[in-house]
Amino acid sequence: MKLSKRGEYALRALIDLGIASELGLPMLQASELAAKEKLPVKFLEQIFMQLKAAGYVESKRGKFGGYSLAKRMDRIRFGAVIRLIDGPLAPIRCVSQTGYVRCSCPDEVHCGLRMLMLDVRNAIAKLLDRYTLADIVEITLRKLRRDKVTSPFLSRSTKLRAVLPPVINRQENGQPKFNSVGSTSRKRRK
């Protein structure tokens, strides 16, 4: 799996829409997002069309229009978005669950390369399918707040820690929620 520029921009745009939503901004214009992320507006609009067709975002025309999330953030999984934009997560097609194509190997069942790539595919899918937009927005806002960084979506110079409620660590299925990708929150023991 290689994340294309289109896939990267789609994920960044969704994260920005999620942050804006959490800050109480109902919509963002494509030009505002493009300026923040330093992306071509036309390319971003094409990505939004694809995300809109899949039901991830909605748009409103007019002076106060723009884009907003069409689904709850906890219903948007990163693996699904990447599959939509870039296709299968598998590094080779013969291990893909969504775009399987038989490889040229004469004995696919006993192919060592296929077994290795299947493990790679499963690890990637497990990680990307575990994270929701809500998780990543929470992690991002926590870091912005901790570092006392002003949100790029607030025109005034209000610090995030004055705007945001404290973030509480949640647990899912007895497992700690991630504070940042790949690290869990743990209290120090004396």
Tell me what each language-model feature is.
Residues 70-163, 178-179, 186-190:
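Non-DNA-binding regulatory cores of transcription-related proteins
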Residues 4-8:
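Short helix-coil-helix linker/hinge
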Residues 53-56, 84:
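Residue cluster at the C-terminal edge of the helix-turn-helix DNA-binding motif
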Residues 27-38:
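A short alpha-helical element within helix-turn-helix/winged-helix DNA-binding domains
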Residues 55-70:
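Beta-hairpin "wing" of winged helix-turn-helix
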Residues 10-24:
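Short amphipathic alpha-helical interface segments
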Residues 17, 44-54:
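Basic amphipathic alpha-helical segments that dock to polyanions
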